[in-house]
Structure formats: C-alpha cells, structure tokens
C-alpha cells in the first residue's frame, strides 16, 4: 500500500515548501449546504462561527442549552478544531417555542443565524465547502505560481487526505489488525473510522496507479463515468469512446475510481481489470470490506477546485480561495503546491 505522502503527484513533486495553518485564521472553511432553511418544521438549523472547538463539542453544548438529548443535534460534517469555520447544526425540538439562541454562548463559538427547518440535517448532506487558506514561508514562488495555473486547468488527484487515516495512520493500522483477526469490533466509532480508512486507502491506491499513466485521463473501455457534480455514473463503451473523451476533456464528465466493497464495482472489461490489478496485493483489506458488507461505490478520480483564485501578500505568503464539493480534501490541493512543514493528520475533514 502506497503511503499518502508517496502517492503520485499529477504535477510532479513540488519544489517549494511552506507552512499550512501557522495559526487558525490561516485555514477558514465556510460550509455550503446548497439549500436554505424552510422557515418551518420541528427542527432548527443553526449557523455557527467557531474557532478552537470541534463540531461534536459545540453540538453537545447546544443540546445541553436546549435541554434535549445529544443525539437530537446533528450536522453535515465535522469541521477542524484548529481553524476558523462556519457550519450548520440541526436541533430537533418538536412542540417547543423558538428559543432565543443569541443567549447560547461558549468560548470560541458564535451563533450567526437560525431558522426552522422541516428535515433533520444528516451526515454528508452538504453541497461543498468554500476555503480560504494562507500559506506562509513559501519558497520557490515561481514554481508555486506555475502549479496554481496548472491546477486551475488540470485539477489534482481526488485523493482522500491523510486525516482520513488518523494520526500516524492509526485508523488504517486498526483496519489491518481487524482484517487479520476474526475478533468483532464493538466500538461503533472505531468500526466506522477503520472501515472508512480501509476503503479510502484502496481508492487512493487505484488513483495512484492510474495517475502514473501518461494517458491517465483517457477513457478506457469499461470506465465508469460520472456527470460532473452528480453521484450517478454509467459505463463507457468502445463505440462511444471518442464522444465520451470529448466530454471528459471539457470537464462535463469525470472518470471515476472504485471505492471497493461488496457488490459490483461498476467498471467492466479493461477498466475493471486495471482496478483489480491496482489493489491485488491488498486482499486483507478487501476481504474486511466484504466481510463487513461495506457497499462498493464510485468517486471521481480528479478534483477541480472551483472559483480558484490567489493573491500573493508578499514573496513568501500567498492566500488561496477555492470551493470544493463535499467529500473532497483541501489538503489534496495543497500537496500539489508545496511540501508542507508538518503533516495533515491533525486537520479534520
């Protein structure tokens, strides 16, 4: 299994180095749900601004303030503790008057707005996130500038970031130990983290092997293609290859890679053979996913940061702004720009 730091670079290994997150204000994330509150219903959507506290801690504090069980407060995704983040929490308060949430105060957290909503906010139910990052002590400015131009055109590999695998790869190591034993794992959080790490590592390995190919973004017979921004996909045939390639080149379609698990992977013929060969040495992790009935899925092979723009504050400091769809990692963009001082594992997804 290829370690995250050794995964193939689309634009070659960066020449420069720099600091990511010298302070929390250098990593700003604004959640984009893709919809507005309904204005009615038994739930309350609460938009918060936080710095120095993690999402679960704030959700539990909100539940305590509202005098409801912690499970009645949900969110679409975890946001980093050591960053400035805006996100939505959702509290189920059936039959209750609208509370005055301006009175909800904890250190490092502020309520920006709140409104009634009809449905629970579920994990993953967001459109994406807008990022503002500041990279400091950057060397080789010309190389970074050229890479920004290239990323704007060609994107980056859509790798799962190092934080998916835990500090020191602990989640992936846990998955491997589990795969090698028949002992049940009863801790639900560990099960979730370890299975997610296993499937993500296999996906990264498939993308890693494909990006090594000079023609990696050429449609192969049997590829599973996805409409940009959509979850559904279809299988490419040789007869359609020229037209499908045109649509891939125009970023209307995305070539996907497998998130292995039980059931059909989605690819056929040449594409399926390639994916199977890419992870042929990872039988233990594949067997674990089958044993635990984790359903196979697809994920775009490339990631195109949207609305990408940048501003050099001076020769060694650059501010980046971009938007990424849900499930994508800002650190997978940054790794194509600079070699960061430190690691990514402490940065929440």
Curated annotation (Swiss-Prot):
<dbReference type="InterPro" id="IPR043165">
    <property type="entry name" value="TruD_insert_sf"/>
</dbReference>
<dbReference type="GO" id="GO:0160150">
    <property type="term" value="F:tRNA pseudouridine(13) synthase activity"/>
</dbReference>
<feature type="binding site">
    <location>
        <position position="329"/>
    </location>
    <ligand>
        <name>substrate</name>
    </ligand>
</feature>
<feature type="binding site">
    <location>
        <position position="129"/>
    </location>
    <ligand>
        <name>substrate</name>
    </ligand>
</feature>
<dbReference type="InterPro" id="IPR020103">
    <property type="entry name" value="PsdUridine_synth_cat_dom_sf"/>
</dbReference>
<comment type="function">
    <text>Responsible for synthesis of pseudouridine from uracil-13 in transfer RNAs.</text>
</comment>
<dbReference type="InterPro" id="IPR020119">
    <property type="entry name" value="PsdUridine_synth_TruD_CS"/>
</dbReference>
<dbReference type="InterPro" id="IPR011760">
    <property type="entry name" value="PsdUridine_synth_TruD_insert"/>
</dbReference>
<dbReference type="InterPro" id="IPR050170">
    <property type="entry name" value="TruD_pseudoU_synthase"/>
</dbReference>
<dbReference type="GO" id="GO:0003723">
    <property type="term" value="F:RNA binding"/>
</dbReference>
<feature type="active site" description="Nucleophile">
    <location>
        <position position="80"/>
    </location>
</feature>
<feature type="binding site">
    <location>
        <position position="27"/>
    </location>
    <ligand>
        <name>substrate</name>
    </ligand>
</feature>
<dbReference type="Pfam" id="PF01142">
    <property type="entry name" value="TruD"/>
</dbReference>
<dbReference type="GO" id="GO:0031119">
    <property type="term" value="P:tRNA pseudouridine synthesis"/>
</dbReference>
<feature type="domain" description="TRUD">
    <location>
        <begin position="155"/>
        <end position="303"/>
    </location>
</feature>
<dbReference type="InterPro" id="IPR042214">
    <property type="entry name" value="TruD_catalytic"/>
</dbReference>
<keyword id="KW-0819">tRNA processing</keyword>
<dbReference type="GO" id="GO:0005829">
    <property type="term" value="C:cytosol"/>
</dbReference>
<keyword id="KW-0413">Isomerase</keyword>
<dbReference type="InterPro" id="IPR001656">
    <property type="entry name" value="PsdUridine_synth_TruD"/>
</dbReference>
<protein>
    <recommendedName>
        <fullName>tRNA pseudouridine synthase D</fullName>
        <ecNumber>5.4.99.27</ecNumber>
    </recommendedName>
</protein>
<comment type="similarity">
    <text>Belongs to the pseudouridine synthase TruD family.</text>
</comment>
């Amino acid at each position: 299994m290829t370690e995250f730091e050794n995964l193939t670079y689309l634009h070659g290994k960066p020449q420069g180095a720099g600091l990511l997150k010298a302070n929390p204000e250098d990593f700003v994330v604004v959640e984009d749900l893709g919809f507005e509150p309904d204005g009615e219903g038994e739930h309350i959507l609460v938009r918060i601004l936080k710095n120095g506290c993690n999402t679960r801690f704030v959700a539990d504090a909100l539940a305590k303030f509202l005098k409801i069980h912690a499970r009645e407060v949900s969110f679409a995704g975890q946001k980093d503790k050591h960053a400035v983040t805006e996100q939505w929490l959702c509290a189920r308060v059936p039959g209750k008057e609208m509370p005055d949430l301006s009175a909800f105060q904890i250190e490092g957290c502020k309520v920006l707005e709140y409104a009634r909503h009809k449905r629970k906010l579920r994990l993953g139910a967001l459109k994406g996130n807008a990022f503002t990052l500041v990279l400091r002590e950057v060397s080789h400015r010309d190389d970074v500038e050229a890479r920004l131009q290239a990323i704007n055109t060609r994107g980056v590999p859509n790798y799962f970031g190092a934080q998916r695998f835990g500090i020191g790869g602990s989640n992936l190591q846990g998955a491997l130990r589990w795969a090698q034993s028949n002992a049940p794992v009863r801790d639900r959080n560990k099960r979730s983290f370890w299975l997610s790490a296993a499937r993500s590592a296999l996906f990264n390995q498939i993308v890693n092997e494909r990006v090594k190919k000079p023609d990696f973004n050429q449609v192969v017979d049997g590829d599973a293609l996805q409409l940009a921004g959509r979850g559904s996909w279809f299988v490419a045939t040789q007869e359609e290859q020229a037209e499908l390639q045109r649509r891939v080149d125009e970023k209307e379609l995305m070539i996907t890679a497998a998130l292995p698990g039980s059931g059909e992977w989605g690819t056929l013929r040449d594409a399926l053979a390639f994916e199977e060969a890419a992870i042929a040495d990872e039988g233990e992790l594949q067997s674990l996913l089958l044993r635990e009935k984790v359903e196979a899925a697809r994920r775009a092979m490339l990631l195109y940061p949207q609305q990408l723009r940048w501003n050099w504050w001076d020769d060694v400091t650059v501010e980046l702004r971009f938007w990424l769809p849900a499930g994508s990692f800002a650190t997978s963009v940054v790794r194509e720009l600079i070699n960061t001082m430190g690691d990514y594992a402490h940065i929440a997804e």
